Amino acid sequence: MNERDVKVRIHGIDEMGSAADGPGVRSVVFFQGCHRHCPGCHNPETWSPCGGAETTVGAVEDHLLAVRTRRVTISGGEPLEQLTALRALIARLNADGFDIALYTGGSRDEIPEDIARSVRHLKTGAFVQELRTTTKPFVGSSNQTFWSAA
């Protein structure tokens, strides 16, 4: 199957630009569905695997190509819960020259190596409300880690 035809369920796309979801002003793609249900989650509307809208990787790619920035963060929800779509979207965005960040509540060990090698930035770790921070860049709680490739 062509990567562009792969189905993906997203909550939405913030193309207005975020400076909180990785280096530089970035668009954010919010994947739909998350089993973690972290108390205090910033995006609880993304939890239901049936919410949001089903679309194609190609439609998401086209939407992002129409935006001026070539920086994008894939967040959610939990992107790792849609591995086929995540791999296809990352492949398409890399082909288009995007700087990609992936936000996951999982640990570094939970991220498949092919995905970890295909993105420039990773945010790992579940949000813990008692550890909430506003002083550590690009994370919501101090237990989370933000990784950048050299």
Go through each PLM region and give its residues:
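Conserved alpha-helical substructure of the radical SAM core
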Residues: 44-72
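Short secondary-structure boundary segments
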Residues: 76, 104-106, 125-127
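Acidic, low-complexity intrinsically disordered segments
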Residues: 2-11, 129, 142-150
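Conserved C-terminal portion of the radical SAM core fold
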Residues: 68-74, 94, 129-133
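Canonical radical SAM enzyme core domain
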Residues: 48-59, 80-116, 121
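N-terminal [4Fe-4S]-dependent radical SAM core
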Residues: 1-30, 35, 39, 43-49
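P-loop/Walker A phosphate-binding loop and immediately adjacent motor/lid segment at beta-alpha junctions
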Residues: 80-91, 132-150
